[in-house]
Amino acid sequence: MDTTPELLLCQRIRDKLKADKQVLFAEFDANNQVNPLVTKLRRAVDVALTEAWTGLELPGDVALVAVGGYGRGELFPHSDVDVLLLLPGEPDAKMAAKLERFIGLCWDLGLEIGSSVRTVDDCIRESAADITIRTSLLEARLLIGNKALFKSLQTRYQADMDAADFFQAKLLEMRQRHAKYQDTPYALEPNCKESPGGLRDLQVILWMTEAARLGDSWKQLFERGLLTEREAQELTRNERLLRTIRARLHLLAGRRQDVLVFDLQTALAEAFGYRQTTNKRASEQLMRRYYWAAKAVTQLNSVLLLNIEAMLFPSESMVTREINDRFVERQGMLEITSDDLYERNPHAILETFLLYERTPGVKGLSPRTLRGLYNARTVMDASWRNDPVNRRLFLAIVQEPQGITHALRLMNQTSVLGRYLINFRRIVGQMQHDLFHVYTVDQHILMVVRNMRRFAIVEHTHEFPFCSQLMAGFDRPWVLWVAALFHDIAKGRGGDHSKLGTVDARRFCKQHGISREDTDLIAWLVEHHLTMSHVAQKQDLTDPDVVKAFAQVVGNGRYLTALYLLTVADIRGTSPKVWNAWKGKLLEDLYRITLRVLGGARLDTHSLWAQKRDDTIAQLRLKAFDPELAKPLWDKLDMSFFMRQDARDIAWLTRSLFNKVNSPNPVVKARISPAGEGLQVAVYVKDQPDLFARICGYFERKAFSIQDAKIETTRDGYALDTFQITDPGLAGDYRDILTLVEHELGERVRLECPLPDPTQGRLSRQSRSFPIKPRVDLRPDERGQYYLLSVSANDRTGLLYAIARVLAKHRVSVHSARINTLGERVEDVFLVDGSRLAADNRLQIQLEQDLLDALAI
């Protein structure tokens, strides 16, 4: 500001605007009415801008025009204020200076101003080339200035508007936007404006209809026949919820914030009146409401888009193919033959999805069918669920050899699945803040079904060849799809969801006439769907007792194969971060060794050692290595080493160390992991009390994640430690760093310098917002020789080093480590030397306390 009058003008307008906003925000806090808020905020800004325009005495031949959302007549607390400075011609230097002063004043008023300076010709030319500009001008609104000039813009804009072209451009833009958000409204941190099912989807519909002069409100679309009254009411209600969420987010963040970030979800939920219960956080209750609204928006959005498209692009050849007297196929879409079909014949609801699976060429449901399903929700009641015909139809859908995943997803999108399986409805939109699931429970369940179905599809056999091989020989695989549908169906009820889900599964099987044999398998899978994962990732698979106990739980090969396939599909369906090749190897190893036990193989130490020795010798001979050269190294190692290592790993270590068994210097060897992901690193050195911590510290500094560790001590005091590590940042390209790891880690071990203090590693926002209470469990194993140390906590960089340093401080040696990272949570299991712990109970207590301190956030 150059002059005192302008300073005074700015101060007066700013103070007035600030006071108006405070009053409006207080009203909103009191009544939670979002529509009056965004309207009154817009009016307050209108007044501020027109006063600034008048105060600066802008020329009368210029027009100040509101565009975008502001032009639409609504303004959220911290939204951009988009304006167009419409000129009659190119501005001279004097005009440009005045316009710059006006824009500067707007910023001084505290407005997030978005401005453009154009003539009418500029607007028409640029809107033709840019769909964003064309859209912003659709809702242009004159604030002050040259009315005739603004009218000229409107006339030319409307004359140039091609509704069909606009529809196609906005549809493409929407698809690109949805792809950016993975085509799902069910993100952990959805954007209430831009994500699928968000406010932008509603705006796109109204932009399309306004461009086609079909209406610019849900009421008008109802009057034009594009919506039913009920659909218009539903859209109005969900739009109001999304608007309220967006306004609350802005106010909580104190800035423009459209993403429901973890940091704000709890405060936002409390602003809506939600409170934490025994089974659900307040944030989970709010997010479920959001997901239901977004789902409804997505569903109605699909109906409206297809209807608008049909009006703008009437097909000249509306060829239909009759399927039966209830359904036809029209241009690849399954269509009902009468609007009231589902009310007259409720059986046709499930028949829709069976025909969708069975009819070649059908790729979706027509607008008429989608609308019919949407409006038939009241028909889907208890009597409909209990109808024997419907039960036969649903079982047929699940047993169909193709199209199952797509059919179930479509049933969920149209809310039919949740209305048929009423317990499924309870978990629709239920988020799991357990730090490793990234999908809502219903989406996770359908993802697991999809993963198992892919094992059965020839085109996907390259993804998991072993699983595909097992699936190909599995009789009646549909029992697996049913088990997948029920494995997490009891989440969020309180209690053990596996046992509660088992009851649901048995009831379903009884109601649907499923045989006793298949019922028992389905129910057993639901009850034990976590068992194999727990054994593989937390127990010692080289312990014959562990494998025998697991084999007793499983009982036979069919149950084992079914559980293995479900476990792989389940872990892969939690999050892209959770599955890795190492977990795959552990599960496959457990499957194969258990199958041997079930087949009658002996599982005693001597027979296993004999088999391992023969396999290792075969591996060595494949590499043209004389097995006799292995004797000096093998004579130094206990039988436990051979029991805990794979034959190919023993062969690799033998070839790497056979001529270095008495090396005075550390020997470090690294190779691409045979598991298919990451590195395998071996360290051979004179044993040190803090060796495990020292190695963990190196891996922490290099940002490697340790997946597994095996710690051995030779009879003459050497340590032979092997590690399975990964580095997410390398994206699988590890070859260039093998030599670097061997050199640097060797130096780190050789120097034996004091252990540095652990760093307080960074936590993800999710972990900060939903911390879990650290847990430490220390108990002796059955033989009393070792102690099992189980640790669970929020994951963070350097956590394993912090644990290892505490163990080193107390001179507790690590025998093995099983590192289980589940998204943002770790569940690690260590086998530690029990000699000192057994002799001193106080040491156990102090160790547990020090570990809890190290795990604390």
Swiss-Prot record:
SS bond partners: none
All copies of domain HD, residue ranges: 441-563
Region (Uridylyl-removing): 323-679
GO MF, one example: phosphoric diester hydrolase activity
Region (Uridylyltransferase) residue spans: 1-322
Keyword vocabulary terms for this entry: Hydrolase, Magnesium, Multifunctional enzyme, Nucleotidyltransferase, Repeat, Transferase
EC numbers: 2.7.7.59, 3.1.4.-
Database matches in CDD domains: ACT_ACR-UUR-like_2 (cd04899), ACT_UUR-like_1 (cd04900), HDc (cd00077), NT_GlnE_GlnD_like (cd05401)
Reactions performed catalytically: [protein-PII]-L-tyrosine + UTP = [protein-PII]-uridylyl-L-tyrosine + diphosphate; [protein-PII]-uridylyl-L-tyrosine + H2O = [protein-PII]-L-tyrosine + UMP + H(+)
Named cofactor requirement(s): Mg(2+)
Biological process terms in GO annotation: regulation of nitrogen utilization
Activity-regulation annotation: Uridylyltransferase (UTase) activity is inhibited by glutamine, while glutamine activates uridylyl-removing (UR) activity.
All residue ranges annotated as the ACT domain in the record: 680-760, 788-857
PROSITE patterns from the UniProt entry: ACT (PS51671), HD (PS51831)
Keyword Isomerase: no
Domain notes: Has four distinct domains: an N-terminal nucleotidyltransferase (NT) domain responsible for UTase activity, a central HD domain that encodes UR activity, and two C-terminal ACT domains that seem to have a role in glutamine sensing.
PANTHER family: BIFUNCTIONAL URIDYLYLTRANSFERASE/URIDYLYL-REMOVING ENZYME (PTHR47320), BIFUNCTIONAL URIDYLYLTRANSFERASE_URIDYLYL-REMOVING ENZYME (PTHR47320:SF1)
Role played: Modifies, by uridylylation and deuridylylation, the PII regulatory proteins (GlnB and homologs), in response to the nitrogen status of the cell that GlnD senses through the glutamine level. Under low glutamine levels, catalyzes the conversion of the PII proteins and UTP to PII-UMP and PPi, while under higher glutamine levels, GlnD hydrolyzes PII-UMP to PII and UMP (deuridylylation). Thus, controls uridylylation state and activity of the PII proteins, and plays an important role in the regulation of nitrogen assimilation and metabolism.
Family: Belongs to the GlnD family.
Protein name, entry field: Bifunctional uridylyltransferase/uridylyl-removing enzyme
Organism: Cupriavidus metallidurans (strain ATCC 43123 / DSM 2839 / NBRC 102507 / CH34)
Recorded name of the encoding gene: glnD
